[in-house]
UniProtKB/Swiss-Prot annotation:
NCBIfam families: PRK00011.1. Keywords: Mitochondrion, One-carbon metabolism, Pyridoxal phosphate, Transferase, Transit peptide. The lineage of its organism: Eukaryota, Fungi, Dikarya, Ascomycota, Saccharomycotina. Interconversion of serine and glycine. It comes from Saccharomyces cerevisiae (strain ATCC 204508 / S288c) (Baker's yeast). InterPro entries: PyrdxlP-dep_Trfase (IPR015424), PyrdxlP-dep_Trfase_major (IPR015421), PyrdxlP-dep_Trfase_small (IPR015422), Ser_HO-MeTrfase (IPR001085), Ser_HO-MeTrfase-like (IPR049943), Ser_HO-MeTrfase_PLP_BS (IPR019798), SHMT-like_dom (IPR039429). It catalyses: (6R)-5,10-methylene-5,6,7,8-tetrahydrofolate + glycine + H2O = (6S)-5,6,7,8-tetrahydrofolate + L-serine. Its main location: mitochondrion. Pathway: One-carbon metabolism; tetrahydrofolate interconversion. It is an enzyme of class 2 (transferase). This is Serine hydroxymethyltransferase, mitochondrial. Its EC number is 2.1.2.1. Homotetramer. Interacts with NAP1.
Length: 490
């Protein structure tokens, strides 16, 4: 045997022996979850079955695409990348830089933004932290912000606190928070009252954003009010970012200084978030002096190193895919269908005698006012869950309890993804009506002994689980909805 051939054979034998020695370790990283962890695989299969055989009405949920899922489970998650493109604290990030830069470029393109006038940070892990990062970037501890009150359709991350002043969101511990409200007669944001409050409170930031508000937002009026008190206008479009991208609802960008959003709701991407911020000149003084925005460095520093370490590169790659999908004609058609379905759904519920907060909807969600029935939102959510329908209890204007509110929040994005149209949402309205009636009957069977509210709800859950009527309807719904495809055929 030639010397070179002998050396090669020896080397191959060494590699082979090493392979034998490390076969267990190799198996550990190469087995699919079905083989490596059957217990967790069984849980995954259960959730897949639940999603396929349930009606998803939670307006903040959606079914993301197979392409997005591919990136979420990709090798991009293996890389650590503290810092920003071109300015990393670790080597080997040249390709990751391409991914993040592509995501940023697509985000600006999707919303028609000039890169000279707008920037975007795509590293925030989710929506509530993204809002905190903005506040921390432009406010000192103890400075003031205003957001829509939670019972009126706002969000915890907009500074929610109890009427007593007790902070619920830690944001209201770090900053002074004052809520604005809807008009309880119309269910619409009371802009006149907001203007009065803002002039007196003088907030540093006003948040234009909601999580349970079914009407359009007047961003021009928000800008007028913000300018009148010298506040930044931060618009949180987490719920409607897909609708905004498709131009089926008004865009906040023309009037806002900062815009935040999640990417997994109507945008139908992965569970991530983005912060858009203005660049260039903010204003000009009477003497002609230009005042710059100076938001880019502050916000980027707040994200990293202020609050986060390395970004989730697999999520950013998946966001880039979702943003490209959102530029397609098919996506725009989907978003219009979301709104059309929502309005139809609202009409069907109204015909059945249900009262809706604000009287209807202009977007992707509906809030049912159950105060005219014999059950609260918690019980209706409970029985719907037993019937394979996912919805959520929600506070409505005037509610005093977030645990047992009078509202039920429902939406159309997820089931529109699965192909639902008018006929299907008419059927879903009937299922909701049946659920409310069943809940009213079961509530009369609750123990008459004195129990606290939580214990009574637990008794109601037992009644749902023991009801033959609930079991029969649950089976019917599971079989019916299981006929509709789920992305990726899960």
């Amino acid at each position: 045997m030639f010397p070179r051939a002998s050396a090669l054979a020896k080397c191959m034998a060494t590699v082979h022996r090493r392979g034998l020695l490390t076969s267990g370790a190799q198996s550990l990283v190469s087995k699919p979850v079905s083989e490596g962890d059957p217990e967790m695989f069984d849980i995954l299969q259960q959730e897949r079955h639940r999603q396929k055989h349930s009606i998803t009405l939670i307006p903040s949920e959606n079914f993301t695409s197979k392409a997005v899922m591919d990136l979420l489970g990709s090798e991009l998650q293996n890389k650590y990348s503290e810092g920003y493109p071109g300015e990393r604290y670790y080597g080997g990030n040249e390709i990751i830089d391409k991914s993040e830069s592509l995501c940023q470029a697509r985000a600006l393109e999707l919303y028609g933004l000039d890169p000279a006038k707008w920037g975007v940070n795509v590293q925030p892990l989710s929506g509530a932290p993204a809002n905190l990062y903005v506040y921390s970037a432009i406010m000192n501890v103890g400075e003031r912000l205003m957001g829509l009150d939670l019972p009126d359709g706002g969000h915890l991350s907009h500074g929610y606190q109890l009427k007593s002043g007790t902070p619920i969101s830690f944001i209201s511990k770090y900053f002074q928070s004052m809520p604005y409200h809807v008009d309880h007669t119309t269910g619409l944001i009371d802009y006149d009252n907001l203007q009065v409050l803002a002039k007196a409170f003088r907030p540093k930031v006003i948040v234009a954003g909601t999580s349970a508000y079914s009407r359009l937002i007047d961003y021009a009026r928000f800008k007028e009010i913000s300018q009148g008190c010298g506040a930044y206008l931060m618009s949180d479009m987490a719920h409607i970012s897909g609708l905004v991208a498709a131009n089926v609802v008004p865009s906040p960008f023309e009037h806002s200084d900062i815009v935040t959003t999640t990417t997994h709701k109507s945008l139908r991407g992965p569970r991530g978030a983005m912060i858009f911020f203005r660049k260039g000149i903010k204003s000009v003084t009477k003497k002609g002096k230009e005042i710059p925005y100076e938001l880019e460095k502050k916000i980027n520093f707040s994200v990293f190193p202020g609050h986060q370490g390395g970004p989730h590169n697999h999520t950013i790659g998946a966001m880039a895919v979702a943003l490209k999908q959102a530029m397609s004609p098919e996506f725009k058609e989907y978003q219009q269908k979301i709104v059309d379905n929502s309005k139809w759904f609202a009409q069907e519920l109204t015909k059945m005698g249900y009262k809706l907060v604000s009287g209807g909807t202009d977007n992707h969600l509906i809030v049912i006012d159950l105060s005219g029935t014999q059950v609260d939102g918690a019980r209706v959510e409970t029985i719907l869950s037993a019937l394979n329908i996912a919805a959520n209890k929600n506070t409505i204007p005037g509610d005093k309890s977030a645990l047992f509110p009078s509202g039920l929040r429902i939406g159309t994005p997820a089931m529109t993804t699965r192909g639902f149209g008018r006929e299907e949402f008419s059927q879903v309205a009937k299922y909701i009506d049946s659920a409310v009636k069943l809940a009213e009957n079961l509530k009369t069977l609750e123990p008459t002994t004195k129990l606290d509210a939580r214990s009574r709800l637990n008794e109601f859950k037992k009644l749902c689980n023991e009801s033959s009527e609930v079991a029969a309807l649950s089976g019917e719904i599971s079989k019916w909805v299981g006929q509709y495809p789920v992305p990726g055929d899960i």
